[in-house]
């Protein structure tokens, strides 16, 4: 065995180790308490659907919850059946879809390397071509270790659930568009996958699941100054039908069950009004996502910025440096890949920058495109020396190690102040496991999951907001003078404990909220 072969074997072992580390890190620490307003709500919706054996109608507190489609809930329901109703199960589908996003990008890299090898007539791998065959690994590694993907793949929310099928659909389209094979299978299967995953995207987060892929493809053709071929144009007929058939698994029975109520709540209120207004109180400046998206590429931000600088230089100066010309050898499809990634990145950026409602996760479907540009630059960077390759692999591993340290030693501390789980556990251990739970001067979304079945609600299913101790007293009287648990912000705790209307015993607090056992005096 020569030195070159030994070096390649050693390199493959390193890549295998990093792949296993990626899988480990994406499932590690998913059992921390649910955080924020969304995770506990979505996890509870799935639990209620599972308890009713209802795969169609989402509910929260028994009331219809028509904000989002079903895919996340289905993933959580299946996970609950396998792992039980736990935080890990609630997040398992998100982690799986995070890995699916990474794998889709790896497939893209493999396709580019294979096409490049074919075009150059190179059927065997040689030492100087190694960086090209490794491009798929670099693309996957950079995606896996980006802070945006690491963070959102750990949350029981819809953003990563949308990002994977959009990534899979666009990768499928690019393979169709660039494939040199003319066989029926090679030309049609990627198109079938493109439209199938559009259907899955519709199940993931609604209309955006079809708007983004088609708009990105259209913008790509515009940037590339070319017309789509007949095969793609004709595919719009049968392909759109395929996408709608996949989406109909949920949309059709939902409409049959709820009619205009579903259309108004889901499409009008949570699609059009959410986009065109600030009804849901998430305002941000126009440039918000132009800052958020680059930050999601950390720790690869310098490479992303360098890639963008090179791209701008090439666009506006119509020339390439000698170094860039040499780097062009990475792939014969490099310019078309860059054009496609640019279209992929700009469409969501432009779309959501005009939205009246802005949250960081909205821009996640654009992150894979940013990572393609980043990985393209980084793969060229490591061609200069073996030391650079080792340095970047080490950076990715250190990022994984940093995540483990944060989850092990810091996240639980932060979660303690953000969750009511420990408060309710403490109260239950004191003999109040059957007591109703009220919220005074707050509506804790976290309690939706951890206080399930015990929260006070209005007739329409919405949580009741209590403004004073008198309302607590009134509820106790209506509840047969049984003691209740009250979640109250610490700044209002004295109002409860010093009241002449009720007797309150503070059982625990998390630094933000306290839980008290309350009865009549």
Description of each model-found segment:
Residues 514-521:
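Core SAM-dependent methyltransferase catalytic element
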Residues 15-17, 91, 388-398:
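N-terminal signal-anchor/signal peptide hydrophobic helix marking the start
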Residues 378-392, 399-400, 418:
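Membrane-interfacial segments at transmembrane helix termini in multi-pass membrane proteins
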Residues 1-2, 9-322, 326-384, 410, ...:
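Membrane-integral, polyisoprenol-dependent glycosyltransferases
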Residues 351, 485-487, 517:
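Structural motif
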Residues 243-246, 398-404:
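Small-residue-rich segments of transmembrane alpha-helices in multi-pass membrane proteins
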Residues 400-496, 501-513:
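Short periplasmic/luminal acceptor-recognition loop of GT-C membrane glycosyltransferases, typified by
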């Amino acid at each position: 065995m020569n030195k070159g072969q030994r070096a390649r074997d050693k390199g493959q072992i390193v890549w295998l180790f990093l792949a296993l580390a990626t899988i480990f890190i994406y499932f590690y620490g998913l059992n921390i308490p649910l955080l924020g307003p969304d995770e506990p709500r979505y996890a509870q919706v799935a639990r209620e659907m599972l308890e009713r054996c209802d795969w169609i109608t989402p509910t929260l507190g028994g009331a219809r919850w028509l904000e989002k489609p079903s895919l996340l809930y289905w993933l959580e329901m299946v996970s609950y059946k396998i792992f039980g109703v736990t935080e890990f199960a609630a997040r398992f589908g998100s982690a799986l879809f995070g890995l699916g996003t990474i794998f889709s990008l790896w497939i893209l890299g493999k396709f580019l390397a294979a096409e490049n090898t074919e075009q150059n007539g190179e059927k065997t791998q040689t030492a100087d071509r190694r960086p090209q065959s490794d491009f798929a690994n670099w693309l996957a590694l950079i995606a896996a270790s980006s802070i945006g993907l690491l963070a959102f793949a750990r949350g029981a929310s819809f953003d990563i659930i949308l990002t994977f099928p959009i990534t899979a659909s666009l990768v499928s389209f690019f393979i169709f568009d660039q494939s040199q094979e003319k066989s029926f299978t090679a030309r049609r299967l990627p198109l079938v996958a493109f439209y199938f995953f559009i259907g899955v995207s519709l199940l993931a987060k609604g209309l955006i699941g079809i708007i983004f892929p088609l708009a990105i493809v259209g913008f790509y053709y515009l940037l590339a100054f070319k017309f789509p071929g007949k095969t793609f144009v004709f595919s719009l007929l049968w392909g759109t039908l395929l996408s709608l058939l996949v989406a109909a698994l949920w949309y059709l029975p939902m409409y049959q069950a709820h009619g205009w109520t579903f259309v108004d709540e889901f499409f009008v209120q949570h699609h059009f009004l959410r986009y065109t207004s600030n009804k849901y109180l998430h305002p941000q400046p126009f440039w918000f996502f132009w800052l958020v998206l680059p930050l999601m590429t950390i720790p690869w931000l310098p490479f992303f910025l360098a890639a963008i600088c090179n791209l701008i230089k090439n666009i506006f100066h119509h020339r390439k440096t000698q170094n860039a010309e040499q780097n062009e050898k990475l792939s014969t499809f490099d310019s078309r890949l860059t054009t496609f990634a640019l279209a992929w990145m700009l469409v969501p950026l432009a779309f959501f920058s005009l939205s009246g409602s802005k949250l960081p996760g909205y821009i996640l479907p654009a992150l894979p495109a940013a990572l393609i540009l980043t990985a393209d630059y980084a793969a060229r960077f490591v061609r200069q020396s073996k030391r650079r390759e080792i340095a970047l692999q080490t950076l990715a591993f250190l990022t994984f190690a940093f995540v483990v340290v944060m989850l092990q030693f810091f996240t639980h501390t932060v979660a303690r102040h953000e969750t009511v789980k420990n408060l309710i556990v403490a109260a239950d251990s004191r003999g109040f496991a059957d007591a109703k739970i009220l919220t005074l001067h707050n509506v804790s979304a976290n309690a939706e999951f951890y206080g399930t079945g015990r929260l006070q609600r209005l007739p329409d299913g919405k949580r009741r907001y209590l403004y004073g101790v008198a309302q607590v007293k009134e509820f106790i009287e209506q509840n047969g003078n049984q003691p209740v648990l009250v979640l109250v912000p610490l700044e209002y705790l004295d109002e409860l404990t010093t009241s002449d209307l009720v007797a309150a015993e503070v059982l625990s607090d998390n630094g933000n909220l306290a839980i008290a056992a309350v009865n009549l005096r």
